[in-house]
Curated annotation (Swiss-Prot):
Organism: Oryza sativa subsp. japonica (Rice)
Domain of life per record: Eukaryota
Principal location listed in the UniProt entry: secreted
A GO-annotated cellular component: apoplast
Taxonomic classification: Eukaryota, Viridiplantae, Streptophyta, Embryophyta, Tracheophyta
Subunit structure and binding partners: Oligomer (believed to be a pentamer but probably hexamer).
Protein name per the record: Putative germin-like protein 9-2
Keyword Secreted in record: yes
Glycan attachment sites: 44, 60
Keyword DNA repair attributed: no
GO MF entries: manganese ion binding
Length: 214
């Protein structure tokens, strides 16, 4: 998916996202400039420690085939240790046509989504079970409040890309479908909860894989 010059300019706007996410941050404050990894030597810290290059593969579309399914590339504390204590992280989301980021939550942070290329339909549900939806174009932003179940969907026939900023170095993710149907909850419990029968539950579980515990 080739990014237009306009789309690349939108990425520059994303540098302001950390300022907002810091306001919403929930990570514990630190008493040092930054957190050195366990058993790390402060004398060995260089600019490389504060640099993350994992998004290059996302934007270097000329050398990599377009994915055929929804793909997320994270830059959280796990992938970018320098974020530890900084209360900020990013993720890139790539949506081929007719793909979805299924309903999920981030228990430790709000999410600020910037559509970089293409268009997305998004929404979240609040604690009163009210659904809020919006159709977004390139350049639009949408905030998903902390802990709310939300989704993003590319219903069009063109690919889409988005950048998400979080107010935590480890926002966490709880995918609703696989968490409910792929973690070993008794089938009878699920059948009664969804007012259906066990064979229907088994059909729902057949195509789901357990969530990643990393």
């Amino acid at each position: 998916m080739a990014l237009s010059y306009y789309s690349l300019l939108l990425l520059l706007l994303a540098v302001w996202a950390p300022a907002l996410t810091l306001v919403m941050a929930g990570d514990p404050d630190i008493l040092t400039d930054y957190v050195i990894p366990a058993n790390g030597n402060p004398m060995n810290i260089t600019g490389d420690f504060f640099t993350f290059t994992g998004f290059r593969k996302v934007f270097n579309t000329s050398s990599a085939p377009e994915p055929n399914s929804f793909t997320v590339t994270k830059a959280t504390m796990a992938e970018f240790p320098a974020l530890n204590g900084q209360s900020v992280s990013y993720a890139t989301l790539v949506f081929p046509p007719s793909t979805v980021n299924p309903p999920h939550t981030h228990p430790r942070s709000a999410e600020l989504l910037l559509v970089v290329d293409g268009a997305l339909s998004v929404g979240f549900i609040d604690t009163t079970n009210k659904l809020y939806t919006q159709d977004l174009a390139a350049g639009d932003m949408f905030v998903f409040p902390k802990g709310m179940v939300h989704f993003q969907f590319n219903s069009g026939n063109q690919p889409a890309m988005a950048l998400s900023a979080f107010g935590s170095a480890a926002p966490g993710v709880v995918p609703v479908p696989v968490t409910v149907f792929g973690t070993g909850i008794d089938d009878a419990v699920l059948a009664k909860s969804f007012k259906t029968d066990v064979p229907t539950i088994l059909k729902l579980k057949a195509n789901l894989t357990p969530p990643n515990k990393s």
